[in-house]
Amino acid sequence: MAQERREGGRGREREERDDGMVDKLVHINRVAKVVKGGRRFGFAALVVVGDQKGRVGFGHGKAREVPEAIRKATESAKRDMIFVPLRSGRTLHHDVEGRWGAGRVLLRAAKQGTGIIAGGPMRAVFETLGMHDVVAKSMGSSNPYNMVRATFDALKSQMHPKDVAAARGIKYSTLQARRGTAVAAEE
């Protein structure tokens, strides 16, 4: 019972599937289509799905009933998953900024034990991704769709240090040595 309360939150369901995927309902919206006889109501759902090991995706589904909209959104999220390299399996390799429409998010790597410091829809993305330590700031639009898409834009630009070293044409060990001196200088 205490476990259920801890993972709760307004409008956010967490469900683990038998295939190891975790999905979270980020936002549900009631929409209306005006027809000759009046209004025809439907629902739109935004769902984030991840394996908590570095793969995450989001999906949007629309239907006349809520469960059907959630099912469609979940299927859409599973089709469009991305892989995000994590440092020590818990945080980002480097700070990054993402944009989508009027939404802007800033994601920063954090020390172990920091936790997920993020608001609203971004928290759902990080929890399903399997990230444990991150500091995120949302600027601009607070629309959940824009926030999720901006977060994914930022996560897609995340690079593993080996890829950075290859792009710069230097050895990975040289890059790690530079990073070690930079971290020592900060402390």
UniProtKB/Swiss-Prot annotation:
The source's domain of life comes to Bacteria
Which BP terms does GO give this entry? translation
Write out the GO MF terms. rRNA binding; structural constituent of ribosome
UniProt keywords (A-Z) are: Ribonucleoprotein, Ribosomal protein, RNA-binding, rRNA-binding
Q: Which SUPFAM superfamilies match?
A: dsRNA-binding domain-like, Ribosomal protein S5 domain 2-like
Q: Which GO terms describe its cellular component?
A: small ribosomal subunit
Domain spans labelled S5 DRBM: 21-84
Listed PROSITE patterns: RIBOSOMAL_S5 (PS00585), S5_DSRBD (PS50881)
Its domain comment says: The N-terminal domain interacts with the head of the 30S subunit; the C-terminal domain interacts with the body and contacts protein S4. The interaction surface between S4 and S5 is involved in control of translational fidelity.
| Family per similarity comment | Belongs to the universal ribosomal protein uS5 family.
Task: Tell me the function of this protein.
Answer: With S4 and S12 plays an important role in translational accuracy.
Quaternary structure, per UniProt, is:
Part of the 30S ribosomal subunit. Contacts proteins S4 and S8.
| Entry protein name | Small ribosomal subunit protein uS5
Species lineage: Bacteria, Pseudomonadati, Pseudomonadota, Alphaproteobacteria, Hyphomicrobiales
